[in-house]
From Swiss-Prot:
This is Signal recognition particle receptor FtsY. GTP binds at residues 265-272, 347-351, 405-408. It holds the Pfam family SRP54_N. Involved in targeting and insertion of nascent membrane proteins into the cytoplasmic membrane. Acts as a receptor for the complex formed by the signal recognition particle (SRP) and the ribosome-nascent chain (RNC). Part of the signal recognition particle protein translocation system, which is composed of SRP and FtsY. Its EC number is 3.6.5.4. The gene is ftsY. Residues 40-62, 82-97 have a biased composition (Low complexity). Keywords: Cell membrane, Cytoplasm, GTP-binding, Hydrolase, Membrane, Nucleotide-binding, Receptor. PROSITE patterns: SRP54 (PS00300). The keyword NADP does not apply. GO terms for biological process: SRP-dependent cotranslational protein targeting to membrane.
């Protein structure tokens, strides 16, 4: 069921995922190259910055020179004293020589803190091996350059303002989905939806929801881009499929008995068979039913519905061909009230919305019987034709819900997706075969999961 549409939706999911991942990887590679280039240039700048302060420092030998000058001054003073006091000459001379030797040793062996100054005084070139003080600034600058390459906005219009943002997100385990990533896949999805008989207005709504959900989003580290796209598709489909949805079983359970259901639609779409299927459906839930044949114009209509009634052991209310449909269904309601029957299932003649006389009959049934629910029946395989007919019937005589037959033969799913959004009235059941049990209660969530499930 709906396999063709399912494949198209999966193709869209894969296309978006591949496009986003490929562009993110390319942006990350480019940003990494930029970071490497910045890192390579950083050590040279660091060396230059380290050398300039050494050259600009004042000569560190000045304190020693001052010390030597002081020693010379002391020697001269000692010499004067020696001249004035010849008796102390020998001791003074010994003291001067000791001081001179001490100063000489001090000048020849500089303190550890003056190593750089000594190198500056002697003019020696610095060692080729970087010192511990030089390594740390180099690594810091390289790290800063790499971070800047990933986080700063790129002002080059040729690469796009989002390139580095995408690269940064990819580097942290995330992928940013940009509008350009969706342009081609969304166009292909739109064509796929239209080819699957999804109504134009519905297709546009689906695409707009996907844009809102995806553009500018980043996937979490715990999920894939495909999962993010699947979530957007899920929300977009669910929003259009679930319009007007209500709990059919609860509505029947809470309604005053007998509950009257009227079935309408064009000829040959399976209204009568659907009535028989619902009779079996209600029987399983413990409800009693009576069938009323309001299709009084079609030859053989009484015989067709009688076969179903006999097969299911149900009471049938019918008039002669050409009778008043409203009168037949009214008699069905009277019988249900008299025999404590829970539900009346009333058939009507197939008609087009342009058949004024037949549409007037529906209006009369509404006045005379006051049905609890009027259900539109059409074929799922009719696609957009079914959608348009549902719209027209709803405009002419308001419907409460729709039933799609032959859903098991429909690979497109366009009608199933579109009818609720177009009419504002929900799809309630899907016919999925010829047997009386071959009818499914329509569940929007289950429908979306079926469309987005993995290919078998």
């Amino acid at each position: 069921m709906f396999d063709g549409l399912k494949k198209k939706l999966n193709r869209f999911r894969n296309d978006v995922e591949e496009t986003a991942e490929e562009k993110a990887e390319a942006a990350a590679d480019e940003a990494e190259s930029d970071a490497d280039a910045e890192a390579e240039s950083a050590p040279a700048d660091t060396d230059n910055a380290a050398v300039e302060p050494e050259a600009s420092e004042p000569a560190a030998a000045d304190p020693d020179a001052d010390a030597v000058g002081d020693a010379d001054a002391g020697s001269e003073a000692d010499a004067v004293d020696a001249a004035d006091a010849p008796a102390d000459a020998e001791s003074s001379s010994a003291a001067v020589e000791a001081d001179a030797e001490s100063e000489s040793e001090s000048a020849a062996t500089p303190e550890p803190d003056s190593e750089v100054d000594a190198g500056a005084d002697t003019g020696d070139e610095p060692s080729g091996e970087p010192t511990a003080d030089e390594v740390e600034p180099r690594e810091s600058l390289a790290s800063d350059a790499a971070k800047a390459a990933l986080t700063e906005e790129d002002e080059d219009d040729s690469s796009g303002p989002g390139r580095l943002r995408r690269a940064a997100a990819f580097a942290t385990g995330k992928v940013v989905i940009e509008e350009e990533d969706l342009e081609d896949p969304l166009w292909e999805l739109e064509m796929a939806l239209l080819q699957s008989d999804v109504e134009m207005q519905v297709a546009e709504e689906i695409l707009e929801t996907i844009r809102e959900k995806l553009i500018g989003e980043t996937r979490k580290q715990v999920e894939s881009t495909g999962q993010l796209v699947s979530e957007a598709l899920h929300d977009a489909l669910y929003e259009v499929i679930s319009v007007g949805q209500f709990d059919f079983d609860q509505r029947i359970a809470e309604a005053d008995k007998p509950v009257t259901l009227i079935f309408t639609g064009i000829n040959g779409v399976g209204k009568t068979t659907t009535i028989a299927k619902l009779a079996k459906y209600f029987e399983k839930q413990g409800y009693s039913t009576v069938l009323a044949n309001g299709d009084t114009y079609r030859a053989g209509a009484n015989e067709q519905i009688r076969e179903h009634a006999e097969a299911l052991d149900k009471k049938l209310i019918a008039h002669e061909q050409g009778g008043d449909p409203a009168a037949v269904i009214y008699d069905g309601v009277e019988y249900a009230e008299a025999h404590d029957i829970d539900i009346v299932l009333g058939d009507t003649a197939g008609r087009l919305h342009t058949s004024n006389d037949l549409m007037a009959q529906l209006e009369k049934i509404d006045r005379v019987v006051g049905p609890d629910l009027t259900l539109f029946v059409d074929e799922a395989v009719a696609g957009q034709d079914a959608v348009e007919r549902a719209r027209q019937f709803n405009d002419a005589a308001a419907i409460d819900g729709a039933i799609l037959t032959k859903a098991d033969a429909d690979s497109n799913g366009g009608a199933a997706i579109s009818i609720a959004y177009v009419t504002g009235k929900p799809i309630l059941f899907l016919g999925v075969g010829q047997g009386y049990d071959h009818i499914e209660k329509f569940d929007p969530e289950q429908m979306v999961e079926r469309l987005l499930g993995e290919d078998e």
